[in-house]
Amino acid sequence: MSALPEEKSSQINASSHSINPASTNTASIQGRFISFEGTEGVGKTTAIEQLCNHLQAKGIDYLRTREPGGSPFAEQLRAILLDPDTTINDDTELLLMFAARCDHLQQVILPALQRGTWVICDRFTDSTVAYQGFGRAHGDSAVRAKIESLIRQFVVQLPELTLWLDLPVLEGMARANKRSAADRFEQQATEFFTRVHQGFSILASEQPERIQRIDASGSAEQVSQRIWQTVQEKFALS
């Protein structure tokens, strides 16, 4: 996975569970913002690659990026957050996630959208709700309220479409275990990822217009076709 955004050679203001993005001038935004979500091992990397291939075939400029990370400073925070040897409390983890996100938005995402470039992001705010709000905090309402407050204060643009790749937790973990050494999140127990999955499911039920569940079972090509059909319908692509 590349460390920094990858741009290839072309409207948005999505709502989120009673969350309005932080106030900013987004009138000049012309691009589309799509995020991918899911627990470990659901196939996001492959799915993103194949969506980008579809966009390129359509002549649509796109920028592929990720969270945590996506900008030089955010990538430094990513290294800390994913390092298995990092020992930090939950509040520190949450605030580092938002520090990385603020820089990523200002340095990478917003400039791309203002150029008319489509932004394809591997994880965004929904991962924070699912991982920190449900995985770490067991769905505690106070923690979720804290996360939503941070979104309102610091996230100036939400995705117009979020593709939640849904796969049974144990199946995803089995896939993930075939990869290289596990990072700090991948080392968590099954119960953690069960809560994360529950978080994504709740988010999808609360925001059905923005978050689309994609069945991530079957072949990569089958999943790619489900995603492309959803994107075509959302953005009226022929």
Language model segments and positions:
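Hydrophobic anchor at the beta1->P-loop junction of P-loop NTPases
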Residues: F36
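Walker A (P-loop) phosphate-binding loop of P-loop NTPases
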Residues: G41
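Conserved lysine of the Walker
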Residues: K44
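Hydrophobic positions on the alpha1 helix immediately C-terminal to the Walker A/P-loop
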Residues: A47
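A glycine- and Lys/Arg-enriched "phosphate-lid" helix/loop adjacent to the NTP-binding pocket
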Residues: D126-Q198
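NTP-dependent small-molecule kinase module
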Residues: S2-S15, N20, Q50-C52, L170-S238
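Pre-Walker A (Motif I) flank of P-loop NTPase domains
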Residues: I29-F33
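ATP-dependent small-molecule kinase phosphotransfer cores
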Residues: K58-V155
